[in-house]
């Protein structure tokens, strides 16, 4: 028996028991049939049923207004079908229109015998059963008029059946929800017994539902993990409250947070293994244990830090006591040794450094002074300091930047002394003397350096530089221009090879080169080309120097060159820094020697100008950070200015000039030897026909 027959049972009982169903007499009225056919034709033209828009209450009105017409209509329509089929049709219509059914049942006792057949006739006009046999043409036309409501009811039936099927499928495939209850059988294995997760007598027909269940469980477990995280964070906050005075505690708290995150990851993995409750509990206990351990560590570090700060304060107090003892002696008038003064200086520096280190340790808990051991700890009065603790850690107080007094106070206190690479002091006196000697390394023994004999540095006297006294054939060589017999190198001149000294040969070669360049330019272009500015400047300076030298040719005058050095018959440097010796017995004439000096001065002026130009170019390229170079350039330019002065002998030569150019001290009573003849400039010689040799 299907659901359709079950729904029709109550109405069939009413139909069988009610007397009106049994008293219906079939009747045939021809004019009513024609009227019905006419209505069906009109309905077919409009494609709508004739009584589609009429409400159910109109049927009740028709029962009272047309009782005589409805009865033959019923007799016509009730002939072909059987009583059971009519009851089924009436039941379907009763389901679709509940107002008619209720009115029919309530008014069944008072209604006439034609009321219920009228309802059945209306039902027959609206719906035709699928299995009904068509008897005549009139019945066929009436059934074709009611196709649209038939389709709507079919759709409604199909929708209801589909809903029933889906509900049945859900009931069939949905597994029963097994709650994660406690272990009732007290079994340690969660995958055995009736409490095992996922074990059911109903076979799983769809794996999608299983995945959904697992996802739900994982979400629940994730919520548990979030609760565990909040608990662990509370524990960390408690640790922070207990250790607000240090930064080490903050670092340890960050470590605790990392541990908590790792534990949460472990909980997620355990969710996949379906061991959620036990694992969460275990991890919570582990987190609590780790937090307690961190609390203990923080307390240990706090105690250690307190000990460290107390140790620094004790050192500060001890050093202050040293200062108080020294100052009290000084106020009383008792004599104070240099050792005590040095200890006081070291103590004051140590107090400053200790306070700086204390501030650093308070602000940064991870700060540790990793410095070499100080020499202060090796002193007799400060030997109680802990090993490895350095109290001279400030860069302002480092041995390389301290003054010699502070260095003496820190390092000359007896015992072994430690020095860096930049220190000028050492433990024993011999090494200190060697350092002092090395610091005065101006008199190095280079290949062409100056020599000294006698003077203040006799202990540091070095053997003189080697001079070439070359003999060309059997005679001794001398410069044809200046008459010098000692020169580093003999050069070619206008008279042939090895006729000029080094300085004169270079000057002559330079002049010849410039003349050749001028000739080449004049011959190539045919136009008088002006010289470059540098060449003009050099020429002007050389002419000025020559004029000044000619004007100051008296025997009681001293020529002062443009580089600031007195042009006496002392040892004068040439271009390469090699001094010439005019006082030697092999010198031919002082006048020619003075000419050589003038030439050397001119060359020096030119070199100074070149250097100044180079420095200016560098300063233009590097505008930032070259202020020192500017100062040096200014000094060079002032030195390169020609200042011809005449000073009578005896004269006092400045010590700095002597030290910078001469390694020996010159006595003040030394007089310049008389010069015979006039001083002839190099330019005048060049204007004449070649170089001449003056005796």
Swiss-Prot record:
- Write out the biased-composition intervals (Low complexity): 87-111, 140-149, 210-298, 434-446, 544-556, 564-646
For this entry, list what GO says about its biological process.
Answer: regulation of DNA-templated transcription
Q: Keywords assigned by UniProt?
A: Coiled coil, Metal-binding, Zinc, Zinc-finger
Q: Which organism is it from?
A: Dictyostelium discoideum
* InterPro entries attached to this UniProt entry: GATA_TF, Znf_GATA, Znf_NHR/GATA
Please list where the region (Disordered) is annotated. 82-111, 134-304, 422-472, 523-646
* Gene behind this protein: gtaP
Q: Which residues form a coiled coil?
A: 150-174
Kindly provide the name given to this protein in its UniProt entry: GATA zinc finger domain-containing protein 16
């Amino acid at each position: 028996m299907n659901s359709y027959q079950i729904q029709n049972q109550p109405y069939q009982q009413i139909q069988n028991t009610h007397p009106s169903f049994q008293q219906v007499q079939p009747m045939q009225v021809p004019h009513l049939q024609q009227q019905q056919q006419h209505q069906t034709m009109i309905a077919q033209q409009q494609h709508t049923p004739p009584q589609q828009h009429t409400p159910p209450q109109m049927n009740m009105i028709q029962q009272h207004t047309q009782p005589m017409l409805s009865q033959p209509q019923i007799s016509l329509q009730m002939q072909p079908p059987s009583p059971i089929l009519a009851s089924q049709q009436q039941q379907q219509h009763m389901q679709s229109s509940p107002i008619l059914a209720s009115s029919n049942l309530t008014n069944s006792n008072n209604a006439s015998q034609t009321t219920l057949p009228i309802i059945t006739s209306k039902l027959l006009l609206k719906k035709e059963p699928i299995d009904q046999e068509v008897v005549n043409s009139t019945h066929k036309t009436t059934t074709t008029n009611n196709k649209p409501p038939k389709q709507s009811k079919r759709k409604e039936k199909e929708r209801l059946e589909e809903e029933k099927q889906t509900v049945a499928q859900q009931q069939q495939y949905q597994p029963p929800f097994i709650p994660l209850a406690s272990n009732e059988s007290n079994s340690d294995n969660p995958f055995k017994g009736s409490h095992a997760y996922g074990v059911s007598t109903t076979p799983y027909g769809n794996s999608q539902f299983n995945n959904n269940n697992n996802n739900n469980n994982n979400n629940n477990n994730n919520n548990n993990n979030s609760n565990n995280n909040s608990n662990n964070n509370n524990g960390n906050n408690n640790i922070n409250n207990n250790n607000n005075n240090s930064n080490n505690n903050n670092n340890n708290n960050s470590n605790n947070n990392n541990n908590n995150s790792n534990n949460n990851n472990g909980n997620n993995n355990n969710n996949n293994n379906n061991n959620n409750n036990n694992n969460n509990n275990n991890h919570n206990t582990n987190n609590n244990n780790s937090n307690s351990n961190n609390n203990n560590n923080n307390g240990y570090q706090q105690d250690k830090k307190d000990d460290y700060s107390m140790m620094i304060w004790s050192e500060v107090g001890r050093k202050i006591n040293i200062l108080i003892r020294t100052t009290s002696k000084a106020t009383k008038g008792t004599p104070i040794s240099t050792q005590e003064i040095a200890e006081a200086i070291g103590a004051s520096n140590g107090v400053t450094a200790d306070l700086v280190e204390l501030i650093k340790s308070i602000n940064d808990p991870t700060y540790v002074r990793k410095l070499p051991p100080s020499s202060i700890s090796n002193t007799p009065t400060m030997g109680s300091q802990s090993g490895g603790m350095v109290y001279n850690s400030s860069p302002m107080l480092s041995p390389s930047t301290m003054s010699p007094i502070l260095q003496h106070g820190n390092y000359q206190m007896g015992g072994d002394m430690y020095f860096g690479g930049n220190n000028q002091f050492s433990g024993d006196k011999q090494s200190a003397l060697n350092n002092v000697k090395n610091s005065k390394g101006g008199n190095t023994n280079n290949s062409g350096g100056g020599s000294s004999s006698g003077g203040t540095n006799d202990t540091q006297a070095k053997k003189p530089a080697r001079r070439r006294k070359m003999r060309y054939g059997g005679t001794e060589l001398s410069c044809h221009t200046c008459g010098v017999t000692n020169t580093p190198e003999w050069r070619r001149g206008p008279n042939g090879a090895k006729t000029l000294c080094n300085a004169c040969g270079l000057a002559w070669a330079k002049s010849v080169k410039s003349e050749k360049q001028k000739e080449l330019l004049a011959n190539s272009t045919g136009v008088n080309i002006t010289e470059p500015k540098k060449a003009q400047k050099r020429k002007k300076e050389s002419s000025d120097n020559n004029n000044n030298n000619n004007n100051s040719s008296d025997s009681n005058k001293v020529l002062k060159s443009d580089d600031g050095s007195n042009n006496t018959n002392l040892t004068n440097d040439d271009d390469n820094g090699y001094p010439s010796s005019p006082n030697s017995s092999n010198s031919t004439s002082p006048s020619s020697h003075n000419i050589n000096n003038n030439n050397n001065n001119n060359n020096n002026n030119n070199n100074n100008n070149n250097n100044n130009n180079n420095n200016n170019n560098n300063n233009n390229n590097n505008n930032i950070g070259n202020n020192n170079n500017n100062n040096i350039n200014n000094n060079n330019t002032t030195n390169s200015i020609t200042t011809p002065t005449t000073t009578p002998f005896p004269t006092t030569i400045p010590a700095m000039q002597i030290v910078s150019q001469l390694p020996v001290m010159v006595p003040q009573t030394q007089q310049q030897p008389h010069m015979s003849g006039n001083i002839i400039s190099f330019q005048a010689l060049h204007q004449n026909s070649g170089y001449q040799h003056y005796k």
